[in-house]
Amino acid sequence: MIDNKVSVCSVGKVVITEVATFASHPLYIDRKTALTMIRSTRAASRLRLGARYYASHAPYGVLSEHLKRTPRTNSQHYYPPPQGAHDLPKVSSMGDSIASIVRGRELWVQEKDKSDKPEKSDKPDKTDKTDKDKPEKQDKDKTDKPEKTKVSHTPSSTASTGAGEAAAPPSAPPSGSGSSSSSGGGSPPAKKKKSPAQTYPEILAVPISDRPLLPGFHRALVIRDPNVMKAIDEMITRGEPYLACFFLKEFSNADVIQDASEVHDIGVIAEIQIQSQDHKRSTVDASNEPVYVLILYPHKRVRLNSLKNPPSSGGAVSYASVSEDVAEDGELLLTSKDLEGYSEEFLEAREEAKKAKSGKTEDSKHDSKVTSKDGKETTEKYDSSTLQESPYSFLSTYDVSTAAISLIEDKPHDKNNRVITTLTNEILNVFKMLRAEDATLREQLSSVVGDILRTEPAVLQEPGRLADFAAALCAGEGKEIQAVLTALDLETRLNRALILLKREHTNAKLQQKIARDVENKLNSKHKKFLLTEQMKAIKKELGVDDGKEKLVEKFNERAEKLDMPENIQKVFEEEMTRLQSMEPSSSEYSVTRNYLDWITQIPWNKTTEDRFNLPQAKDVLDSEHYGMKEVKDRILEFIAVSRMKGGLTGKILLLQGPPGVGKTSIGKSIAKALNRQFYRFSVGGTNDASEVKGHRRTYVGAIPGRLVQALKQTQTENPLILIDEIDKLSSSRTQGDPGAALLEALDPEQNNAFLDHYLDVPIDLSKVLFVCTSNDLSTIPWPLLDRMEVIEMSGYVPDEKLNIANQYLVPQSKKETGLENVNVQVTDDAINALNRQYCRESGVRNLKKHIEKIFRKVVVKIVGEYGQDEVAAEKIIDVEPVEKDKESAEKKTTKSKSKEVNEEPAAKEEKDKATESAESSETKVGTKAPPVTVPEDYSLTIDEKDLYDYVNSPPYSSDRMFEDPPPGVVMGLAYSPLGGSALYIECILDGGLSADSSARLSSTGNLGNVMKESTNIAYSFAKSFMIRNFPANRFFERAGIHLHCPAGAISKDGPSAGCAVVTGLLSLALNHPIDSSISMTGEISLTGKVMKIGGLREKAVGAHSAGAKTIIIPKDNSGDWDELPDTVKEGLTPVFAGTYQDVYDVVFQGLDTKVAAEVWKKQFDLIDRKLDKRGSK
């Protein structure tokens, strides 16, 4: 650390000595630069020991000819200047001045001609002798004309004397220090002197805002008020450079005191020793206003008796209130914490002093009393009328504040007081500790403390000055320093100064510790840097360059751009240390390098800004997808909730629906609506858990899982990740279960610390929006399904498919086939025919294929008609030379790659030429054909009748198998991944009714177990229904029934065909055909209850496609029917059935019950006769 110390030489120069660790040299600057430096000390709010700048200088007359003082001739001077002010003494060098300054003295140096020496301070003053011998004459002179005397101009003297009185010599102790009360044993009595006057004329009063002045210690002061500047100029011109300084109670930048209550009543009288004259160099504020920078030397403590306001404020006189010195014994300032570290001697002395003072009271307003020469305290009242004309009377012409002040002295004390002695020793001990702790103060304090220790008896006689020095050294608050200035009781002053000094010592220790830690850290980094540079130099000399340095530099650059969490940063630093300590040939080198490459590409704490605009999100979803109301509403709800909460959180959504309905594409639209990055990966057929959670680093070619790869690719922590085909996961005994691995990632309570096997550090996935797709929920593991919010996506109805084709599929297909600007139209009838006869699936993927096929046929037709004449003749290209050139270029490139990373310029140039030759050779291979020009009047319309020419014959002719169905045939409804369709139930009598036949039911049609059980339940219910309603009809006693569901290649399962099976069996038993326009669905119970089914939307679409007019559905599905779009319900009459009786009433209207009861009577009569014959035999 560099400590700058400023001193003024006798020739008007300023010397700055820089004390550094390795060198020390002086710099000489001019006066203006010195004032600029002094001004900068104002920003530090004080000039004190230990600051960066400390100035000691001669009186103002040395630096400027303008400031030279002339001998006074005014006989009415009431306050004579100090002795030596006319003689312009010189200041010593820096080495000798520091110790003198901190003790509050100036060291006067002899002139160049050694002959002019100052008189010794121990000689008696002739003025004193004259005054003693002629007291009466002196009293007379007081009335007529004050006697001009010279006062020693040394800070150690009591710089305030009365009219016609001489001050003590420089070597005498200050008044109030205890020397006046004790004469010392055996010494001759001192000559009597007149006691100094205690009341002074009205002089300029200046407020101090940041830190009070202490007697004996220089201080810089900035004056901004122009009136105060002018007053100071005249004061300097008149040779009266003295002013009173008082500390403000509240901070203010004013230079005028408006009322005595604004300042503390105890301040100092100070002498102006340096005044700046260059306004430009003295400007310190942003307004560029001229200011004065004054260097003040405070002499003595004074009390403010009264204050005269500026003339602009009325010139009223306000009187200062006497401050009470609270806690004179220091109890309020000295806490139990402050007592830590005190010596036992001090604590014992302190307790004895407290006991001695117990029960006694003192007048708290002792500051208003003065001490006479005989040691008695008297109260002196200020009366301006008794004073003679003041040399400062000219100040009344300026708009400044003036004050009447009184000199105050320290309270008498016993020099054998143990508490004062112990406090003095404690302060000296703290000085020693400060010298050891603070390097800035070490040089100054070494000389000061050493001198104090050598002259300890003298210090004990001046404890007040020691307390002021300690307070000036400390960086306490202004009120704390003012408390030291106010304390006239030496014990209290020492106590308060000691507390401030101990706080300064604590701060010094803390600063030293911080500096030590910083230095150690810097040294460690510097050492590491030097070793690294040396290693680079050694490798360069040996010709070994493995590229490790560039790799390390690349990783460090990446890491600086990332906001890594603390734990990730620690792992990164450890792996970097490992990488630097490895050799490139090591097997672990590539593993660590790949790991660092991954960990520095993860977007730690980096997110994209979400979009909370509901109308804009709705427009994005509607522009890219038709329908899907439930999905769009859920996304808008998600955005609205996030807007209400103030931020988006991670969600796990599952879109379940048939293929081709847009589950994957809606995921992209959701990401676009939310302004998030999109990443998709399919887990269909995945049977390795490492695909989700990554591989261990020990395996060759190990990489992180797909979730970490998604973060790397999207470069954000809040993307939308689409996990496609999650219902097609599989498991393996050896490679784990990927479905179980997804449990951690898809659990909102756990994914904030997802642990990938490769990275092996927690990763926050809580901000990711997961969207999964599935065709069948039954194959998803239940724990995984429980973590997701399921949104069902139904298949499209014909009207929706028509709109999707016109708005999306047809324009997209025309653009892909080059017909974007050609007038080719596909009519709505053609698209409806495609949906009805070619593409019955719930999705539109197959419809898109057929539309693309149509436009491809159109393109072939157009190119064949208009494109043959425009095709340019193809040139025959010899491919072999091209391949040879390419091979040679590749060989050159391979050779250049085998060299070191740092190639020579010539090698790089060859490589570039080889690459250019290879590229130029490759460009000769392909040719670009000109586009076909189609006439503007060309037009083509594709109608339903033209479909055969483009997409061949339809695979489906009609959904209705029977226009007039026979008895036993009924139209049911089925739902499959392809959508809804009509499912006919056919029942026939197998083998007729005979005596040898028996009741039985057989079923075919690739039925599943659930549907087989449903047919058995329906058969049992049908028999019971016939017994209850048609007891005479004995059909089910002997009938062998065969039940079949057409389209045997398609597997069928589910309980929803129960009502249709019962109806088919009853239709056969009653020999009554069912209307072909009636379709039905519903599960039947054994007692005839019609139960709720699923897939009502698709089944309604199937009924509509089959031409049904009436649809019978369970009563519990009435709410689902109301939610269906009107385009689906149009043309269908719903019938809600609670029991099968409701179904029977609709499908068997107009049935003749008598005929139905006897429809099989003839057959059963024959059977009975045969059985009777067999019985009679």
Swiss-Prot record:
Residues 154-182 have a biased composition (Low complexity). It holds the Pfam family AAA. It catalyses: Hydrolysis of proteins in presence of ATP. Residues 203-505 form the Lon N-terminal domain. ATP binds at G657, P658, P659, G660, V661, G662, K663, T664. GO terms for cellular component: mitochondrial matrix. One of its GO terms (molecular function) is single-stranded DNA binding. ATP-dependent serine protease that mediates the selective degradation of misfolded, unassembled or oxidatively damaged polypeptides as well as certain short-lived regulatory proteins in the mitochondrial matrix. May also have a chaperone function in the assembly of inner membrane protein complexes. Participates in the regulation of mitochondrial gene expression and in the maintenance of the integrity of the mitochondrial genome. Binds to mitochondrial DNA in a site-specific manner. This is Lon protease homolog, mitochondrial. It comes from Yarrowia lipolytica (strain CLIB 122 / E 150).
